[in-house]
Amino acid sequence: MNIAAQTKVAADMIWIRLNVNGGMMLRRLRALVKIEKSLFYQGIGWLAREGKISITKDGWRTRISLVK
């Protein structure tokens, strides 16, 4: 599987987890989605570029949620 396909799969896994559990802190999402760190962040980037997630920062905390 090439890197673009792996990134798409990672993005799908992240989207599904957010759809089921709702918005959450980045650290918790990372713990729930058990994939390689670089693929996780590539998946986050993919979803952000497509406008499917919202990323908000509060101090050191980063919250990720789906855009409805």
What is the meaning of each model-derived region?
Residues 2-11, 25, 55-68:
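Short, cationic-aromatic polyanion-contact patches
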Residues 29, 41, 58-59:
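Short loop/turn and capping residues at structural boundaries
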Residues 35-46:
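Short amphipathic alpha-helical interaction segments
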